UniProtKB/Swiss-Prot annotation:
It comes from Clavibacter michiganensis subsp. michiganensis (strain NCPPB 382). It comes from the Bacteria. One of its GO terms (cellular component) is cytosol. GO terms for biological process: DNA repair; DNA replication. Pfam families: BRCT (PF00533), DNA_ligase_aden (PF01653), DNA_ligase_OB (PF03120), DNA_ligase_ZBD (PF03119), HHH_2 (PF12826). This is DNA ligase.
Length: 853
């Protein structure tokens, strides 16, 4: 998946023919687009896979940008158009806040676009020659190494650019990342950015080993890198633990920049003024840098570099999907600046994906969690862009028709973005008359229910048997366990299939997700399941036997022996009643999941339109599932971040009897469905809490508060948590990492407070932080004549992005002003992304803002 590039041809073609004028319709489309984009981001960054091509992803993002531009009130800080990478929401690894935000890169797709980018850079840079550093764009996993006084403190994934996952132990296991930097005079704090990858030459050997021991194989080296690094040691048998460590030890890293870096505190001999000199400094510290970078005086030389490596891209030790071009002069980095998601002084040239021919053997239809029936191309195995491909999505019957492919055709296949397999079309000249047309089935292939559009005019066909369709139940069980929901380790695709579609016993342990928390060891141990492909649902075949691949995921298997001696060629045996470690881990993690946050429970219920943002808003305002269930449409819609569409979806969901059964059985099994200590729906505001009628914006890192914690503290005190600063804002609580909201507050004369004052404010009210000789009420209230449109937008103004996430914040006191009427209480949708910024200041480092995706 490429990062969004608004000037790409794919994005331009994707501008919708019409933009909904009706705000309600626009809101529905925006919500659907955000859900779709976040789902594919989660697939790419979280599950290390994706079902969408670069062009399709860019088209979705561009349509969302157009709608937000046409309807500014729909834009929010957590929109995919304002954020970087994937969401850092997991309980598998501890969260780590980066000292400086890890940005992404904009893309160019042709030599002409590269020349246009360079021309703009040179215009903006003014007089003087611009030199360009060019390097290979590694297709791996972005990593941030934090060194303090030369000692590695943490290693974290990028996450959402602000908060990543702590993978320090696994990075140290690699054995190639120095725990202590070489030399002397190291700064008190420096962040080193790089990419972790799996060597291409060792990839086939890895997958062969995975097959030998019954583990899943990886689709490509990038997935191998992410899948190896992002795993924990707990709960693994000694054999699996050694296998995990062996995979990690094969990983390699190359560094390509610096994040937070207090330049003034460096020794004089470490001073650098160019990106290329940064690489010399990093190499001197003992960090691995790429040897494939060059500095050029002219963009035409960069173009030659791009062509040369494009022709020899398969000869490098790691996969590449383009060339990164950076302005070499660090002084120009600061002058050119950055947008909210990418630096202006760097770009990524994306190579056109590799194309090959293969045979289209069949088109099969898969049914997903929401009942959507999706045709998939099943092809003769072929290698493309470094990995073997057997299948690719065809999206719907209209796409099949538009591509003009017939079963039996020779088709052109490419890796979109060098990651996603995509069928381009048939090689008509090779047809011999044996080909046949694909006919979309009229019945669900899983439960034989007639397929139909969800509503008139829909292209997609869906299975309406939501309760009992095995594929939909399997998908919902997987969703319950996903990182964005209850984050249950051990409940992946194989376990979900085992619980819902077992070969043995005849009756599945789960008919719906209602019984998930009632599972016992007796339910798990007898299960035998046929392994299915995660996307198509097709049965996987054992390449050695030619038969369907069967596993017993929840009971132990006897090692293959002949005459009492281990023999890998002998058949594996089963011990009928001995639970496996996987069974123990699953039951243990299901028990832990019962006490997850209420918002995660809401997401896990698969209620249409209810994602993490809306779920947080509902949980924060109502405090319990019962309160949400009994609320009226007006009460639901009044919650900021919810609105009429989500309110209707909630009411519709609770109207269904088997939905209510899920809630009732989960509760009976011990699932906690309320926020501990919550005073009830809007109780703090209704009771005239200490912040009743006041709007508070939190930005930067506030000591003692997480991002959600600051929001909840404001709401619990009866206040409104704003996402942007306007004349209706009463206080701005600013900590390290605060961005443009701080400047806007100063310009508007809004009172700025620090973390200590914020704590007093939410606990005791405005009187506790009143200025000397000031009227506390006047101190808290902004002037009349506020701009309602600005406040209603609930989003940063255009041009507000690009703030320095590691700048030192010095709270200032502003003049006192008078108050407007009390504002509505806000929700999690209003949370400022800045609130998750750094706990510790540091000046922006050379080359550190750009992070290859």
């Amino acid at each position: 998946m490429s990062d969004t590039a608004t000037d790409s041809p794919a994005a331009d073609d994707a501008v919708p023919a019409t933009t909904p004028a009706d705000l309600e319709a626009a809101s529905a489309r925006v919500d659907a687009l955000r859900t779709e984009i976040e789902r594919h981001r989660d697939e790419y960054y979280g599950a290390d896979a994706s079902t969408l091509s670069d062009a399709e992803y860019d088209a979705l993002v561009h349509e969302l940008e157009a709608l937000e531009e046409a309807h500014p009130t729909l834009r929010s800080q957590d929109s995919p158009t304002q954020t970087v990478g994937g969401r850092a929401e997991t309980t598998l690894f501890a969260p780590v806040t980066h000292a400086e935000r890890m940005l992404s890169l904009d893309n160019v797709f042709s030599e002409e676009e590269l020349a246009e980018w360079a021309a703009k850079v040179e215009r903006d840079a003014g007089s003087g020659r611009v030199r360009y550093l060019s390097e290979l764009k590694i297709d791996g996993l972005a990593i941030n190494l934090r060194y303090e006084h030369g000692v590695l403190v943490t290693a974290a994934t990028r996450g959402d650019g602000v908060v990543g996952e702590d993978v320090t132990q696994n990075v140290l296991t690699m054995g190639t990342v120095p725990e202590r930097l070489m030399g002397s005079g190291h700064p008190p704090l420096v962040e080193v950015r790089g990419e972790i990858f799996f060597p291409v030459a060792e990839f086939d050997e890895l997958n062969a080993r995975q097959l030998e021991v019954g583990e899943r194989v990886f689709a490509n080296p990038r997935n191998a890198a992410a899948g190896s690094l992002r795993q924990k040691e707990e709960g693994k048998s000694p054999a699996r633990l050694e296998l995990m460590r062996a995979r990690i030890r094969r990983l390699r890293m190359l560094v390509h920049g610096i994040g937070a870096w207090p330049v003034r505190e460096l020794a004089s001999d470490a001073h650098v003024s160019a990106q290329s000199e940064v690489y010399g400094l990093l190499a001197g510290w003992g960090l691995p840098i790429s040897t494939h970078f060059r500095v050029f005086d002219d963009i035409s030389e960069v173009t030659e570099f791009v062509r040369r490596h494009g022709a020899h891209r398969a000869e490098v030790e790691h996969q590449i999907d383009g060339i990164v071009v950076k302005v070499d002069d660090l002084g120009l980095h600061e002058e050119l600046g950055a947008t909210s998601r990418a630096p202006r002084w760097a770009t990524a040239y994306k190579y056109p994906p590799e194309e090959v021919n293969t045979t289209l053997l069949d088109i099969v239809v898969s049914v997903g969690r929401t009942g959507r029936a999706t045709p998939f191309a099943v092809m003769e195995k072929v290698e493309v862009a470094g990995s073997e491909v057997r299948q690719a999505t065809l999206h719907n019957q209209q796409v099949v028709k538009a591509k003009g492919v017939l079963i039996g055709d020779t088709v052109v296949l490419r890796k979109a973005g060098d990651v996603i397999p995509e069928v381009l079309g048939p090689v008509v000249e090779l047809r011999d008359g044996t080909e046949r047309e694909f006919v979309m089935p009229t019945l669900c292939p899983e439960c034989q229910t007639p397929l139909r559009p969800a509503k008139e005019g829909d292209i997609d066909l869906r299975c309406p048997n939501a309760r009992s369709c095995p594929a939909q139940v399997r998908g919902r069980v997987e969703h319950v366990a996903s990182r964005g929901a209850l984050d249950i380790e051990g409940l992946g695709e194989v376990a979900a299939a085992a619980l819902t579609q077992p070969l043995e016993p005849e009756d599945p342990p789960l008919e719906t997700e209602a019984g998930l928390f009632e599972l016992t060891m007796a339910d798990l141990v007898p299960i035998t399941v046929v392994v299915r492909d995660a996307e198509t649902g097709m049965v996987k075949v054992d390449e050695k036997t030619g038969e369907a691949k069967r596993v017993t995921p929840f009971r132990r298997r006897r090692a293959p022996k002949r005459d009492g001696v281990f023999d890998p060629a002998a058949p594996w045996g089963d011990e009928d009643s001995v639970p496996s470690k996987s069974a123990e881990v699953l039951l243990e993690n299901l028990d832990k999941a019962k006490t997850q946050d209420l918002w995660r429970i809401l997401v896990a219920l698969s209620i249409r339109h209810v994602g993490p943002v809306a779920a947080r808003a509902l949980a924060g305002w109502f405090g319990s599932l019962d309160a949400i269930r009994s609320a009226s449409r007006e009460e639901l819609a009044a919650v900021d971040g919810v609105g009429g569409i989500i309110a209707d979806a909630l009411l519709d969901w609770f109207e269904v009897d088997w939905h209510r059964e899920i809630v009732d059985r989960w509760r009976k099994a011990g699932v906690v469905m309320e926020v501990p200590g919550h005073p009830g729906p809007g109780a703090a505001a209704a009771a005239g809490g200490v912040l009743a009628g006041l709007t508070v914006v939190a930005t930067g890192s506030l000591e003692g508060y997480t991002r959600e914690g600051a929001l909840e503290a404001i709401m619990a005190a009866g206040g409104k948590a704003g996402s942007s600063v306007s004349k209706k804002t009463h206080y701005v609580a600013a900590g390290p990492g605060a961005g443009s909201k701080l400047g806007k507050a100063e310009a508007l004369g809004v009172r700025i407070i620090d973390a200590a004052e914020f704590r007093l404010l939410v606990e005791q009210g405005p009187d506790a932080i009143a200025l000397p000789d000031a009227d506390p009420a006047a101190d808290a209230d902004p002037a009349a004549g506020a701009d309602p449109a600005a406040d209603a937008a609930g989003a940063p103004a255009v041009g507000e992005a690009g703030e320095d996430a590691s700048a030192e914040v010095k709270p200032k006191r502003a003049r006192k002003r008078k108050a407007p009427a009390a504002a509505d209480v806000a929700s999690a949708a209003d949370v400022d992304a800045d609130a998750a910024a750094v706990p510790e200041p540091g000046e922006p480092g050379p080359g550190g803002a750009a992070e290859t995706p």
